[in-house]
Structure formats: C-alpha cells, structure tokens
C-alpha cells in the first residue's frame, strides 16, 4: 500500500491511497477463507465448501467486507504513521475491490491544528480570596430557623399578610368557564415571597379565613405557559386558614434538629466551611478562565469545522432542554435553525479554541485520564439523569462520545496543571457596590 497526503487546510487532510494487485487478492482470499469456516451449504461439510463456490455465492458480502476490513487496516497504519488523531468522521471515497486489479481510494479527515504553546510557567494571574462574613452565616441560620418554624393558625379572623402562610382553594375562569389545569385545593401559599403572581397575592390578602372572593388576574406577557401569556382571567379563591410561623430559639437544640450538629457553634462552623469551599472553587475557576482567555490571545490557529459544529449542536440542545423545563419549545424564540446557529456560533468557537489549547497543553504536561476516571464521570451523569450506567456507557461508546468525554477530562486536568505553574496572587474581594 502506498499513500500520498494532501493538506487541504491546516486542520484537514486528504490521503490518496493505492493498493497493489497482490494486496487486493490477499484481502479477498482472507475474506473468502473466513466465510468458508462458517458457511453451511447442502452437499458439503462445514468448512469444506470450495472457495470458488463460496466466492460466487456470497460475492456481494465478501467483497464489501474485504474492502471495509482492508481500508480500516490502512487507516490505522496511516494515522499511526502520520502521528495524528482524526477529530471528525473519516470520509471514504472509493469503490470496491476487484480481483486482479489495483485499488485506489481517498480518505479525508480533520485533525488538531498545530501551533506553539505560549510560555505559561510563571504567568501572572490574580485569584480572589474566599471570605465569609458573620452576616451571611446569620442569614443561613435564619433561613433554617424559618424553615423549621411551626405553623400556627392566627388567633384573630383576618386576611393573610406578608410572612403568613395561607391555606386556600383556587380556580381560574374565562368567560364563566373553568380553565383546565389552573386550580388547586388546600394549597399552601407563603405570602410576600413572590411565589405567585402579584395580582393573585393581592387578592388573597383581602380574604379572611373562612371566606371566599374573586377578582381579575392578568398573566405577564412572558409567562412560562404561552397559552396564558398576557391573558386576563377571573380567579376564585376560598381561604381555609391563615397561619403564622412560630420560630424556634436559635440554640443547640435547633442545630441538633436541623442537621444533627452537637451545637449551634458547630453548625455555624459547617456553614462557614461550606461557603469557603464553594467560593474557593468559584474564584479559582474565575481566575483560570481569565488566565486561559489571556493565553488564547497569544496564539492563532484554525478551528476544525466538525468540532465547532459539535459545540453548536451541544449549545442548541442545552437551550432546548432549558426551554422545555420552562414549558416552552425552541420555536417560541421565533428564530430559524440558521439564526439559532448564528446566535451560538461565537460561544461554540470560543469553547473549541479553549479545548484545542488545553488538549495541546495536556500533551505537553503528559496528562492522562484513566478508564476509571471516565467511568466515574459517566456514573455522575447517570445519577443526574436517572439512567442506567451500563446503558449510558454503551450509548457513549457506540456513538463515539466516549472520546469527547475523555478529552474534556484531559482539558480539565490540563487547566489545573498549567494553573499550578502560574504565579498566582491572592487578592482581597472588591468592596460591595
């Protein structure tokens, strides 16, 4: 086999392959031999069918498999020899093997761009210190205290006010007819917490326990359910009870009941530790992004189209999932697929640039990712999505997604590796506005 490489672009290669007659005939012979071992034909013992009969009987299957097997062998040899890793699907352009004839075909694929990494050792970067003040801890304790409050019916007969919890029935009507899906019984509404529409809360705040009333409610133009957006309906409400919160004392008993802490002091320490850990991670991630953005401005390279397309698809899919959670579809954005692509393209290109840079840094830093680490990431994905781990892993393997997942883990490790070599200065948080 001989081949000639053509660089179509800095990130795309085309390989013209020529296969001599001897190799063609050997590939066909090997495929026929494989068929002979398993084929069953009347009048012949298994494995004893003459090669010529097997070839004539199963010519289409044999020649197709022989071609595919030979091309796959060549692809492995070529990419190994060139020391490249194809990013995209390898496109094949050629016919099928013919006995006694030379075989020619071409393959094309995208590869990572080649560029020189800037010197990142000692790179100056600032990271904000993680700070937690007592007021924030007090606010957390106050929320815990409030959530554990006892709800007690108010002594007097009065409408609910901010801070109260009202137990009520409600139903929406349009032109005197009930609106399906907009009703509830014994619904608990915390007033003053923006849990419902302002018009609805204002109506509820006029109704004492044991009474009912109705009034117009206008849904906002951006309401999640487009069927009600901007619409005015009649809401009928019956209040069963108005309750106030009886707050527990802030003491060791509250800490024990809230989370099994031995004291309120231990509970406060845990809150501080949790805040510190999350903020340290956040500030580190912010500093890493700042460092990466600056390093990316120091290099220039072409972006593989297939890689950008993959991230465009991912971003649009993320958008679709987010919209569905809000009860809406992508079509509610009023944009064509082309307009959506144009909208997310800059972000997709930036993600691709970052990934390419970090994978190059990962090679320089000899970053490795084990199969156990990949499985661990898949386990987390399976738990978050409620899917079976083996089913999810099989899907990732069959669709080639496992390589993208591994690359993402390599990129994350590479970012940590180059950040560890940076000159990081810890700075005080900016004063609150």
UniProtKB/Swiss-Prot annotation:
InterPro entries: PPIase_dom_sf (IPR046357), Trig_fac (IPR005215), Trigger_fac_C (IPR008880), Trigger_fac_C_sf (IPR037041), Trigger_fac_ribosome-bd_bac (IPR008881), Trigger_fac_ribosome-bd_sf (IPR036611), Trigger_fact/SurA_dom_sf (IPR027304). One of its GO terms (cellular component) is cytoplasm. Consists of 3 domains; the N-terminus binds the ribosome, the middle domain has PPIase activity, while the C-terminus has intrinsic chaperone activity on its own. Pfam families: Trigger_C (PF05698), Trigger_N (PF05697). One of its GO terms (biological process) is chaperone-mediated protein folding. Signal peptide: none annotated. Disulfide bonds: none annotated. One of its GO terms (molecular function) is ribosome binding. The keyword Chaperone applies. PANTHER family: TRIGGER FACTOR CHAPERONE AND PEPTIDYL-PROLYL CIS/TRANS ISOMERASE, TRIGGER FACTOR-LIKE PROTEIN TIG, CHLOROPLASTIC. It comes from Nitratidesulfovibrio vulgaris (strain ATCC 29579 / DSM 644 / CCUG 34227 / NCIMB 8303 / VKM B-1760 / Hildenborough) (Desulfovibrio vulgaris). This is Trigger factor.
